[in-house]
Structure formats: structure tokens, C-alpha cells
Amino acid sequence: MSKTLSVDKSQLRSPWSTYWTLTKPKVVALMLLTSVVGMSLAPHEHFTWHQALIALVGIALMAGSAAAFNHLIDRRIDAKMARTYRRPLPKGDVSPFNVLLFALLIGSLGFLSLMLWVNSLTAYLTFASLLGYAAVYTLYLKRATPQNIVIAGIAGAMPPLLGWTSITGELHPHAWVLVMIIFIWTPPHFWALAIHRKEDYAKVNIPMLPVTHGVEYTKTSILLYAILLALVCMLPVLVGMASYLYLFSALVLNVCFVRYAIKLKFRAEERTAIEMFRFSIYFLLLLFCALLLDQQLAL
């Protein structure tokens, strides 16, 4: 009787839910927030809500496509890692061919949306970001060098620039300031996770920094990047993009981030690395929310 009533949850899962998971929606949501900040800080001479909405949809579709390609390319190593073995492809919830079609479909829709209704610069920059993450990072850098996250970090740091160009159609140094914040944030964010999952990465021969250079070296690198990040986060104030609300928020958040890095380096407990990884997500979320609110209050 119990066997009859027992149903595998994967059998109850809808195909739409599976494809939704492939897009890494939480990651995409954070990317869209940083895109909105880029839009908000850009000059608004040619701003329309219609264009902004299409831009966000196009960026989201192409980011989801990059995530799906990542699932497809990494499916074999995902099946061997404790953090990822429950993903749709290792579980057999969807076929690799269907994931390929899905990634191509939403990526194409996103690119066409940006090209036809936003501007070509944003379309090509978003496509370059997709290639940087799905091909350059996932196919090559991830397996080739412990500096994989550092080199490929530019791809994940692009959304604020994409938001900016979707409104203005041109590049601007202020947009690159936002890119720089995410670029410097990326290594300590992922290295904290890599420390926590060191054995997993070693098992599948992924040369993350803790695997190739040791945990202590990685902790030192995280601390140095945390200090550098605190300095870079002051740039929006120094160049006139933000004022006191952002300054106060950035100071508080960076003090907390550096304290986590110091604790990880000198007084680490078993869960310190994963706690820092989780805090780093809230750090970026709150930092960009503060920047957005600061800008809105200044209007």
C-alpha cells in the first residue's frame, strides 16, 4: 500500500518547473536588479518604460540561456558533486537535446528582442556576456586555470553596463564603475564557496583556487579582495554617482564583508566559508538596492 502511495517527486514536477530551474532564476533576478540600477543611473533623455521593459526581458532571456548552456556543459561533473547532483540533467528530468533547444530558443528570442526593440550595442554586449560565461568560462577556463573566476568574472559583471546601454545606446565610464564593483566582488564570493566545497571540486578535477593553491592561500586572497572591494565601492561617491545614503550603506556592508574575511582567515569555524558565501549574495543585493534608492531620493 505504501509503495502504491509513494510517488517520486520528480515525476510530479512539471516540465515548466524543470526548464525554469535550468535558467537559474535567483541568479538572473540579481542580474536584473543590477541592470535596473544601470538603467536608473543612466541619462534619461531617451528613456521609455516600454524600451526598459523589453531590455530587461531580453537580458533575462539571454542570461537564462547562458545558465541552461552551463547546465548542459557541466552535466557530467554536476552528477558527481554533492551541491549539484540534484539538478535536472543529472536527475534525468530532461534530455540534453531538449536543454540545447531550450537554450538556443530563449537565447535567440532575447537577442532578437534587444536587437529589434532596444539597440544593437546592448544586443551584442549581452551576446558577448553569454559567450563569455557559457563558452569561454564553462567550456574552457573553469577546467583550465585556478584564475577561472577572476578572468571570466567580467561576463557576470556586465548587467549594469547592459542596463545603461539599453537606455543610452552608448558606453560611459560611470557604467564601468558598476561593472568593476561586481568584477571585484566575484572572486571572494566564489572562493568562499570553493573552500566549503573543496573536496567536491577536487573529485571532478576542477582547478579551483583551494584545490590548486590550498585553503590558506585562498583565505588570504579573499581577504585582499575584500579590502579592494571596500575601496572600489567608494567610487560611485567619488565620481558623483551617489551620495550619503549609499555611502553609509556601502561602509556598513563592507565592514561586515571584511570582518567575515578576517574571521575566515584567522578564526574560521567549520561553516564560516559557506556563511561568507551566503552573506556575499545579500551584500551585492543590498549594495545595489542602496545605490538605486540613493539615486531615486536624489531626483
UniProtKB/Swiss-Prot annotation:
Give the membrane topology. Multi-pass membrane protein
Q: Name one GO biological process term.
A: heme O biosynthetic process
Gene Ontology annotations for the cellular component aspect, listed alphabetically: plasma membrane
Segments traversing the membrane: 27-47, 53-73, 97-117, 121-141, 149-169, 175-195, 222-242, 244-264, 273-293
* Broad class of enzyme this protein falls into: transferase
Q: What compartments host this protein?
A: Cell inner membrane
- Cell inner membrane listed as a keyword: yes
Q: In which pathway does it act?
A: Porphyrin-containing compound metabolism; heme O biosynthesis; heme O from protoheme: step 1/1
Q: What else is known?
A: Carbon 2 of the heme B porphyrin ring is defined according to the Fischer nomenclature.
- What family does this belong to? Belongs to the UbiA prenyltransferase family. Protoheme IX farnesyltransferase subfamily.
HAMAP family from the entry?
A: CyoE_CtaB
Per the entry, what this protein does is: Converts heme B (protoheme IX) to heme O by substitution of the vinyl group on carbon 2 of heme B porphyrin ring with a hydroxyethyl farnesyl side group.
* Protein known as: Protoheme IX farnesyltransferase
Gene responsible for this protein: cyoE
